[in-house]
A protein has these predicted regions:
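Active-site cavity-forming subdomains of large catalytic enzyme subunits
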Residues: 1-139, 153-165
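Core structural elements
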Residues: 145-151, 165-184
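Generic alpha-helical secondary structure signal
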Residues: 112, 116-117, 139, 143-146, ...
Length: 184
């Protein structure tokens, strides 16, 4: 309501909506070693349709790299995923290649897999005197990680292949939130 009352066009096809439609998206571009070499060599690079495999457009790799860099500088997107490196460092390389990630790219694995993610709010461990309660934090890590491990076996997944791979590989991700606020 506030934006509408301030005169913004709230129509879904309106100019104002168009300018913010991707603000909550997290976009990445996946590049290979061959693409990076084409950037160095200022060579042509073909954009290929994922479904059809047909060349859609050919352009200078260096020009595309500049567009990616400028877009990232302007709005922090796209992120970059280095496909060749990702698959070289694959922790289950004998299974299949890694084709994608979750939106924030902290989880990369084979198709039809999932990672149970959780975060711990670091500010909850900041005592009144400004010290960090390491013992309580360690205890929380142990409890949450154990809970995540239990959840893998008890969770429902959208498809049977995702359920099978989740239970087979048991990927877990435990992170933290509010590091910046904690340090301030």
């Amino acid at each position: 309501r506030v934006l509408r009352d301030a005169g913004f066009d709230m129509d879904l096809d309106g100019a104002d909506s168009f300018s913010i439609q991707y603000q909550n998206a997290n976009n990445s571009v996946r590049v290979s070693d061959e693409f990076m070499q084409a950037v160095v060599d200022d060579a042509d690079w073909s954009l290929v349709g994922v479904v059809t495999g047909q060349v859609i457009k050919t352009m200078k790799a260096r020009d595309m790299w500049r567009q990616i860099a400028e877009a990232a500088w302007e709005c922090a997107d796209p992120g970059l995923q280095f496909d060749s490196t990702i698959n070289r460092w694959h922790t289950a390389a004998t299974t299949d290649r890694i084709n994608g990630s979750n939106p924030c790219s902290e989880y990369m694995h084979i198709d039809n897999s999932a990672c149970n993610l959780a975060s711990i709010n670091l500010l909850k461990y900041l005592d009144a005197d400004g010290t960090f309660d390491v013992d309580a934090y360690r205890h929380t890590v142990e409890v949450v990680f154990t809970a995540q491990e239990i959840l893998v076996g008890r969770a429902d997944y959208p498809t049977e292949p995702i359920a099978e791979n989740s239970r087979r590989f048991r990927q877990l991700g435990l992170g933290y939130a509010n590091l910046g606020a904690l340090l301030m």
